[in-house]
């Protein structure tokens, strides 16, 4: 909603100076050229991208595993607010309508390795983003989702 979007915009502007030393050079360039966040033509909030590819806040740990720089700073106590809910939910996208919220999977080739691993480990997308779905919709909503998913899978 508009309040959540405004809070996220302010949050990203506020924490950027603290995050900057931890970010990759190409991420810093993308942020400084595009801003700490972008509002699309549809009014949706997105993080800036490096060359229309990965998120500008993406970092790599010593094992070359891709991580969210905002989430890492939060986990280390450097910032007090976790990454934006839209990032936390990804690859799930939520589109709010007047009567309901549509929850959809966003397929992007940049995420194909993660999808392959999820398939191999038998971790469906909704379980992968469980914490984020609970953060967005609450425990009760998520438990209802699990029931529906089990029912759906039992019919296959």
What are these language model-derived features?
Residues 1-156:
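Short loop/turn segments that flank or connect secondary-structure elements
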């Amino acid at each position: 909603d508009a309040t959540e979007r405004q809070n996220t915009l302010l949050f990203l502007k506020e924490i950027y100076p603290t995050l900057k030393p931890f970010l990759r050079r190409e991420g810093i360039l993308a942020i400084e050229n595009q801003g700490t966040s972008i509002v699309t033509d549809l009014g949706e909030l997105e993080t800036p991208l490096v060359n229309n590819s990965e998120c500008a806040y993406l970092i790599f740990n010593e094992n070359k595993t891709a991580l969210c720089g905002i989430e890492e700073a939060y986990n280390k106590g450097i910032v007090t607010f976790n990454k934006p809910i839209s990032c936390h939910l990804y690859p799930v996208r939520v589109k709010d309508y007047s009567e309901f919220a549509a929850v959809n999977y966003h397929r992007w080739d940049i995420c194909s390795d993660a999808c392959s691993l999820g398939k191999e480990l038998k971790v469906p997308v909704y379980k992968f983003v469980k914490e984020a779905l609970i953060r967005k919709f609450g425990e009760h909503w998520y438990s209802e989702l699990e029931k529906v998913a089990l029912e759906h899978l039992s019919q296959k």
